[in-house]
Amino acid sequence: MQAYRWTAERVLRELNSAPGGLSHKQAAARLAKHGENRLARKKGDSLWRRFMLQLSDPMILVLLAAAAVSAVLCVVHREFPADVLIIMTVVTVNAVLGVVQESKAEKAIAALQEMTPATSRVLRGGAECTVPSRTLVPGDVVLLSAGDRIPADCRVLESIGLRVEESALTGESQPVEKSAAPLPDDGQALPPSACSNLVFMGANVVYGRGRAVVIATGMDTQMGRIAHALNTAGQNATPLQKKLTQLSKILSLLVLAICAGIFALDVGRSLLAGGLTFSGALSTFMVAVSLAVAAIPEGLAAVVTIVLSIGVTKMSRRHAVIRRLTAVETLGCTQVICSDKTGTLTQNKMTVTARTGVPPEQLMTAMALCSDAHRAGDRMEGEPTEVALVQDAADLGLEKAALERQYPRVGELPFDSARKMMTTLHRTPEGVMQYTKGAPDVVLKRCTHTWQQGRAVPLTEDLRRRILDENRRMADRALRVLCAATRQYPSLPSARSPEALEQGLCYLGLVGMMDPVRPEAVEAIAACRQAGIRPVMITGDHRDTAAAIARQLGILEPEGEVLTGAQLSQMDDRALDDAVARCSVFARVQPNHKVRIVEAFHRQGAVTAMTGDGVNDAPAIQAADIGVGMGMTGTDVTKNVADMVLTDDNFATIVAAVEEGRRVYDNIRKSIQFLLSSNLAEVLTILVATLLGFTILEPVHLLWINLITDCFPALALGMEQGEPEIMRRRPRDPKDGIFAGGMGFDVAWQGLLVTAVTLLAYFSGLLLACPVQMDWAALVHITDPLAHKTGMTMAFFTLSMAEIYHSFNMRSRRASLFSMGQNGYLWGAMVLSLVLSTVVLYVPALAAAFDFVPLSGTAYGVSMALALAVIPVVELVKAVQRAVHR
């Protein structure tokens, strides 16, 4: 339906409606046919499906397979399935954590969506009534006035100075004047921003009043179409998700390969030695299972989830609701932030910033009286420009209500787009005072005098030229400029037409206004630049306005280029790729342009964030690697698709999110390096022992170390504060693997270091337990059960403590441990892990379950000394690395 091409009468006829609206019976029938006037939300996964999705990680699957094998063996041997219970517990806890965090975020977003208005004023059977907005149907006649939010897409039937702010849909910050006149038919479909006789769901009436007939509701509205596209769009994996998935696959393949290799080696050796028995094969298989348990960092998934959750909690305290855990990390590697202007970088509130002419009190008295904006409680209501004028007068001590009591309005000529002026008449002790405000070039043509030193003097051509020059200078600064003039009468004039009143005026002055930038946004953009992040402004506003605001913010250089939507439409993808490489400001853009810009950055390999509050931002927010919505002024559609919602609509929160994202990713890498070097040490320890023909650790020992000893320090590393240079370095390359920057090498040699001290501890235990002196070769083949248990106990305790002490090394990959501040969480984790590891050795029931023996003071001291050795060795290597990189 091209309702904007038809007359108001035809639109009503096509909708089978009338100027007095529908009857209640008609409305009920249409509601049953069309459904409620609400946007459909994307159906989320069920709780069970969410839980199962948490188990799809390859490492989790290998763990579940190991648990299944262990369960079968426990049944065969009639043993208590301790290994199985531990594995299943950690898998379940990790899955529950993920589901709980997602559910909390969804509830936060649902709460934000309750901020929308719920009722509308309509005509039903010719009578005005208030109905729930969700019950509106096509054909309903809606009554609109200043302060209302448009409840559905409507065709204007009557406009009395009706102006609507549509920035949520079009990105245009200035209110648009609406009329009932049909638009000419040139055969081309018009975009919403060009339809002056249509109003759209989600827009706000800022001035005047009118009537409109509903032409579309719910998902059939412009907002609904965008919501549908977003609900059906897929979700891209974040950089962290991709890296962890890749790491899981690599570890899983390595585990399977190592297990198969060890199993084949042992079976082959048994066959060569004289035969393979079932018990021998079973024993070999258990060694392979031990390796699987050792190689997989069971706590990794839970640690990553919890570290991300900690980041989410910290962000929520700083007014950011994270909808997806991994969004925190994605912000940390963001290279480009594409931001809408209105309401995001600016305050979405017109403010007077310049005045010229008569004294401010005299000028703003005229502007305030010649305005329809007014104070309602503690806020101003009305068209944004007039609100700015009335507020500026109030700031000068000139409250409009007091002015109107002193100079009551006795006549007016409302603003219209043809005259570009508004005139009001006010009674004064001397008679009647007229105030006129409007476009400077138009008002100035009606002026014959100017007010100087308390009296009217003729307006010379030279003075007129100087006033117009000042107008141009103000316009060049992206100010919206209005001119004020006056005229005095001894009594109320009988002829009150525009032609009679708006001539022979006396010029008072110019007032310049703009939607000011957020002060914190300037600092935030400077911080982004320091962090190597490129800020880009994408707006529906005029080119000159966008350029001026961008320069104030520091986004655009003095000679920088601004690209318009019209220019962008003429470009193919290759030309656009070149343009986004050099342009940081895009003006007069449509929603599809925003998506193309984001896609162009993607083709260049840039991790891109998109911030915004309007429906027009939503498709690009969906397309970006991370979408940032505004909680206070943002539309429901935008909040639904955003990865993160700023509850204070403060752009500066983005910088905090970037910093938090970088800190979280750094800490996740520290935790991963710690866990992998620890698990590598376990694998190498078992591998060496297997090759030499003895057993050093059982699967239950490894599970205890991985889940009890290692998890607490890994979590404490996730609480580490950001390093000093965190916001002075460039974003990391999203293509970098999890082991980038030499981390893979560090994992390898640190794993070897812990392996060495663990094996030394085992053989030290044998030596301490043997009643006679033995050489090292004999120790490998020792058969004394007590000596073996002592060696195994010392190996377990040394491995546990070495990993705990090694966690202190992981606080920074390059900085010395002794140059850093304190991490109380890590000290707490060390004490807790030390206590738990010691308890296992000395509580008889636990020691028996783990097949341990209590260690003597000497054995305990040797184990601690060997474990502590990892700190000076790593410190020495760090010192060498710092010297090399210096």
Give residue ranges: language-model regions.
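Membrane-interfacial helical/loop segments at transmembrane boundaries in membrane proteins
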Residues: 275-282, 768-790, 847-854
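Membrane-water interface at loop-to-transmembrane-helix junctions
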Residues: 733-753, 782-794
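Alpha-helical transmembrane segments of multi-pass integral membrane proteins
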Residues: 79, 746-763
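Alpha-helix capping/termination and helix-coil
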Residues: 371, 605, 658, 662, ...
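Generic alpha-helical transmembrane segments
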Residues: 709, 790-806
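Conserved cytosolic headpiece of P-type ATPases
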Residues: 1-731, 736-739, 752, 796, ...
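Membrane-helix interface motif
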Residues: 268-272, 759-776, 842-847
